[in-house]
Amino acid sequence: MKPSLALIALAALLGACASNPSGPTTSFSYAVPDQPEGASGYTEKPGWATQKYAVAAANPLATDAGFQILKAGGSAVDAAIAVQMVLGLVEPQSSGIGGGAFLLHFNGKKVEALDGRETAPAAADEKLFIKADGKPMSFMEGVVGGRSVGTPGTVRMLEKAHQQYGKLPWATLMQPAIVLSEGGFKVSDRLHTLIKSDAHLKKDPVAAAYFYDAKGEAWPVGHLLKNPEYAAVLRKIAAQGASGLMEGEVAQAIVTKVQGHATNPGQLSMADLAGYRSQSRAALCHDYKTSVREFRICGFPPPSSGALAVGQILGILNHANAGAIPLENGQPGANWLHLYTEASRLAFADRGQYVADPDFVQAPGGNWMSLLDNDYLASRAKLIG
């Protein structure tokens, strides 16, 4: 019956459109919207199994850096630090030392969560993204420039993780990224696609000189791109720890850039950088049962929405009996994907309604686990048509 009802609804909708009193529009021409981020293709790869260790990252150079650190006797945290420093070079659009991060660590007995997410500048208030006319800024109005820049926490958090679980010297973990920065790395398909389609990098003289040639064209795939300035900052971090970024001349350069933005200055200060501290939070763990076995799933708690969103989606799918839907040629079919999509929508609705910085916002009922309550998820599953 559902397909028939869908066709009836579609026919009614088309009928309403056809009865538009202004008459049909003959000049309509559909315009394909821009992708939010340039795609770099998909390559199917086989699964892998390992008994000792594995490294996964968004770029092969970062993956290899972590692999070499492990082979040298480093810990998982050591490898993660090396991976992040390389990613800041080869995947600058996605992550870097000027941003924030979450780290979930499991030593075989205990799950720990280290919060290195950015924090708002101390001078920020509720009017930060409100225009002079009292209306909220559009996304691009707020995000481009210094206004949206928060206090970076990645390096301070990684430093804390290394103090707890590192085996190799801190400076050693900077070496892969330093070598690649000074010697150069080949521009990937993904990086080329993203800088070619970016509408804002060329407006910044420093970014324009780095990502584009003299004609303003994005560096082609395979171009050897060097970043000695990044290497210089990493050398300071190697020698001084996170303070090499959060204090001194590098910190001052960051603040000057943010506050001095020509059209959208921000409020980040030297005090914000010097005062940043990474926090340890209790991992959010819950039991998940299938028809075959039971799992203990742990993830990062708020301010991350990861553990809650994943837990809610899995719980809602269980109550919707998604596991009873057979695969189609080994792949999920339309009915299963419908349930998954709707479960995700419900989870993200709760994310937008409830999840925020726990230092300022209380969990529903005083406990984040209330969002994973079995009866609550059952009621959410009933909303799926």
Regions found by a protein language model. Name each.
Residues L14-A16:
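C-terminal motif of bacterial Sec signal peptides marking the signal peptidase cleavage site
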Residues Q312:
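Protein kinase glycine-rich loop
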Residues V32-P33, G266, H319-G385:
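Internal maturation/activation junctions in enzymes
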Residues A18-P21:
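Bacterial signal peptide processing site
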